[in-house]
From Swiss-Prot:
PROSITE patterns: RADICAL_SAM. [4Fe-4S] cluster 1 binds at residues 74, 79, 85, 314. This is Lipoyl synthase. Its main location: cytoplasm. The lineage of its organism: Bacteria, Pseudomonadati, Pseudomonadota, Gammaproteobacteria, Pseudomonadales. Its EC number is 2.8.1.8. The keyword Metal-binding applies. Binds 2 [4Fe-4S] clusters per subunit. One cluster is coordinated with 3 cysteines and an exchangeable S-adenosyl-L-methionine. [4Fe-4S] cluster 2 binds at residues 100, 104, 107. It catalyses: [[Fe-S] cluster scaffold protein carrying a second [4Fe-4S](2+) cluster] + N(6)-octanoyl-L-lysyl-[protein] + 2 oxidized [2Fe-2S]-[ferredoxin] + 2 S-adenosyl-L-methionine + 4 H(+) = [[Fe-S] cluster scaffold protein] + N(6)-[(R)-dihydrolipoyl]-L-lysyl-[protein] + 4 Fe(3+) + 2 hydrogen sulfide + 2 5'-deoxyadenosine + 2 L-methionine + 2 reduced [2Fe-2S]-[ferredoxin]. Pathway: Protein modification; protein lipoylation via endogenous pathway; protein N(6)-(lipoyl)lysine from octanoyl-[acyl-carrier-protein]: step 2/2. Belongs to the radical SAM superfamily. Lipoyl synthase family. Pfam families: LIAS_N, Radical_SAM. It comes from Pseudomonas aeruginosa (strain ATCC 15692 / DSM 22644 / CIP 104116 / JCM 14847 / LMG 12228 / 1C / PRS 101 / PAO1).
Length: 327
């Protein structure tokens, strides 16, 4: 199994050119902890079974994304549910490019210096969604710490264009933490709010330094609460990955903190190591434990809890928003 150790006196890599995507070992070279590659990925338990993404609908959606120069987080983050979602004619769109300014070692999205925003992306995204005749869409993004508003205006522009071409559509946004830009980002977001506002805490506070370098647990909680205070009629949502080294007690404590910050919906899923150069899986959480977390979440007052090994923040997001049980 991989181990995480402190760095000491290592030479830093040179400056990355704009538009160059770093992945694997190159991506995590500068984070506060060092990832020692695993010799082999851990064997998944019997309860984790993923559909192979092979169908005409999968190919059709991929071709449509390429045609409009769009990205799906389903592909970029190597989501295990890609086949199921694409085969069902749905996708979670990732805006503002496919290069992230953060280096989270659990994530398979590439890191680097992103290109300038594509001013045509809101229109292209709206056209693609209209072509697919979608009723519920999740829009997410890479982190864009290079932008004055963290990309909030681009989110708003995308929502506005989508609503022009697809009246009645429901839109969920899965936003970054807008580090250092919360006030301006929330002001923009409140003027063109989504139907569901989602921001993932990802893990417990103790593991932030090793799992989410550059992010802050309390900041993320405040982002969700402040949005709720500004737009109280819009549900808020957050999620955790389990298997990074957290304890069950820590998960329960974070769930309680979420409720204290008026978060309405919760997703809990199993962390799966994307490659040898990512954080190792510390445990595979049994489905019975996921079911127990869901029961505890309902007792706490969450309007909906999606909890299961293959649950992801945008997995069956439409059903969760409509109150259906997922897990």
């Amino acid at each position: 199994m991989s181990t995480v150790v402190e760095k000491s006196g290592e030479a830093k890599p040179g400056k990355v050119e704009v538009g160059v995507k770093l992945r694997g070992a190159e991506k995590v070279a500068r984070i506060p902890v060092k990832i020692i590659p695993t010799e082999e990925l851990p064997k998944k338990p019997d309860w984790i079974r993923v559909r192979i993404p092979v169908s005409p609908e999968v190919d059709r959606i991929k071709q449509l994304l390429r045609k409009h120069k769009l990205h799906s987080v389903c592909e970029e983050a190597s989501c295990p549910n890609l086949g199921e979602c694409f085969s069902g004619g749905t996708a979670t769109f990732m805006i503002m490019g496919d290069i992230c300014t953060r280096r989270c070692p659990f994530c398979d999205v590439g890191h680097g210096r992103p290109k300038p925003l594509d001013v045509d992306e809101p229109t292209n995204l709206a056209i693609a969604i209209a072509d697919l005749r979608l009723k519920y869409v999740v829009i997410t993004s890479v982190d864009r710490d290079d932008l004055r508003d963290g990309g909030a205006q681009h989110f708003a522009d995308c929502l506005r264009e989508i609503r022009k071409l697809s009246p009645g559509i429901q839109l969920e946004t899965l936003v970054p933490d807008y580090r250092g830009r919360m006030d301006i980002a929330l002001e923009i977001t409140a003027n063109e709010p989504p139907d569901v506002f989602n921001h993932n805490l990802e893990t417990v506070p103790r593991l932030y330094r090793s799992s989410r370098p550059g992010s802050d647990f309390e900041w993320s909680l405040d982002l969700l609460q402040k949005f709720k205070q500004m737009v109280p009629h819009v549900p808020t949502k957050s999620g955790l990955m389990l298997g990074l080294g957290e304890t069950d007690d820590e998960v329960i404590e974070v769930m309680q903190r979420m409720r204290e910050h008026d978060i309405d919906m919760l997703t809990l899923g199993q962390y799966l190591q994307p490659s040898r150069n990512h954080l190792p899986v510390q445990r595979f959480v049994h489905p019975d434990t996921f079911a127990w977390f869901a029961e505890e979440g309902e007792k706490m007052g969450f309007k909906n809890v999606a909890s299961g090994p293959l649950v992801r923040s945008s997995y069956h997001a439409d059903q969760q928003a409509h109150g259906n049980k997922i897990g």
